[in-house]
Amino acid sequence: MQRSRKLEELRRLVRATRLARANRMTLNEVLEQAAERPHRLTEPSRRRFVKDLGAIAGAGLLLNNLPAHAFRSRPPRIAIVGGGIAGLNAALTLQDAGLASTIYEASSVVGGRIHSNATAWEENQTSEWCGEFIDSGHTCMQALVNRFGLTLVDELEAEPTQSTDTLFFFEQYYGVKQAFLDFQAISDRLEEDANNLFPTTFDPATHFPRSVHLDHMSAYDWIENNVPGGHRSSLGSYIDSAYTNEFGLDTDRQSALNVVYEMGFQPESSEFSIYGESDQRFHVLGGNDRIPFAIAEALPKESIETEWWMESIAKQPDGTFGLTFFTPHGIRYVTADHVILTIPFSVLRGLDYRKAGFDTLKDTAIQHLGYGTNSKLTVPCTNRLWNEHGPWGKGDGSIYTDLFFQNTWDSSRGIPGKAGVLVAFMGGAAGLALDAAQSPFASAETSPEVAMYAKHFLRAANHPWPGIESLWNGRATLSTPWKAPNLLGSYSCWKVGQYTAFSGYEGVRQGNCHFAGEHCSNSFQGFMEGGATEGARAAQEIISDLEGNL
């Protein structure tokens, strides 16, 4: 969904005013900088609160630590740690500017959390182990799709006419129209808070009494205090379930601002959207991993090292960085003039960066940023019962419920065929409960635990969708990225108090060590778009540093 142009201009001026105040600049100076680098103030937002203050608030760290003559006699040495979409797009952006880099990836393949399953299902259907959705406003991912001649499937366009989500709470259906009516009781205050308080970041200039109050309130308590009937109401239970699986942690651990900044900005249509403007509309035909594979193919083969696990990073007296890797060929040492760290903070916090020269706030963000514990159970069915008329109405494949699985969607939307691929997605304690499979990415064929979970899910789903249990074909997969050593979480999530503590600082560079990944994105946290845009941003920092030095 696209935001109102007038409202966005107002928000842009609010952001610029706060940036000017925080950095002792004039409003015109901030707007001139934004004109030179437009994404600073006008980047489309997933959660509708664009707060990329980090790059400017950390202005003291933006200076190139190496002398101006450092690269006149040799090319700069640029190391990118992590071969997910952030690292790959950083390398591609650098290559477009004529700069070479080397990616060091810990696993055996590139892609990070973007890897598809195109072989397990019938009728050439594809599912995603992790990263799945591309929104209408995800311009960076869409640009990569266009650049490499790939095709997007419009999943919303493919849904049957007049189909709706199935809402099922307290063992009864909760109509979408009733949810809209119930939402009216909280919509005005929610919209007021979202408009008046954003952005809320580590910068004290954004710390208004109510934003600080809401940041230190849990999402659970926000529901109890603001939704009539709290968790005893269908709307309260709906919001709790939806935001547990959306952010990946139980609502008693999340900042209330997660709900305010996502649900508070509704699309311009008259319909109520539980996730605000995020429409989760597209996926790539043939699998989303066609994007990282296409980028890798466009880079020199020798520029990607796989199975290189970073053990430590240290800043050298001359301003360069020394990196130590465990590799199949033993320990290897790399010296770099610039480093882009794209690995999740959940992984970085377990590595040795004590000598990297990071400041206290960066260390706090690395050590404490929350990460979701989502699990994704993918279950194929012999037909798409949910699209038929039933006691649930006419479904689009999505369930929101207080049953253990929280949420489903139809991963086969837009793909021809009779059979369907249903995804059950759960976060928080419910996600952690699916922990019996030994591998973080397992199938029913090799893991009896996955088959057990599939049966349990279908038995529960038979309540809102009678008859679904009998349509299972016996296959299933389970993704638990919080168990994967190179991920240790589904995606980042701001916990209670973390907006005001360090939100917006995750991507602030530390000398010539740059940071990228979805966890650095204030606009697209948790999305592939967040990784892609942050990779390009970190690369652009290096390009800007090196202008005139080559």
What are these regions (language model features)?
Residues T42, R47-A70:
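N-terminal export signals
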Residues A120, N124-S127, G131-G137, M141, ...:
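Catalytic cores of eukaryotic secretory-pathway lumenal/extracellular enzymes that build
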Residues K6, T500-L550:
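C-terminal lid/capping helical subdomain adjacent to the catalytic/cofactor pocket in oxidative enzymes
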Residues M1-S45:
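N-terminal secretory signal peptides
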Residues I468-C520:
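A glycine-rich dinucleotide-binding beta-alpha-beta segment and adjacent secondary-structure elements
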Residues A336, I343-L488:
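C-terminal segments that line or cap access tunnels to active or ligand-binding sites in enzymes
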Residues P204-S312, G319-G322, T327, T335, ...:
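Active-site/ligand-binding neighborhood in enzyme catalytic cores
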Residues R72-F198, D352:
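N-terminal glycine-rich phosphate/pyrophosphate-binding loop and immediately adjacent elements
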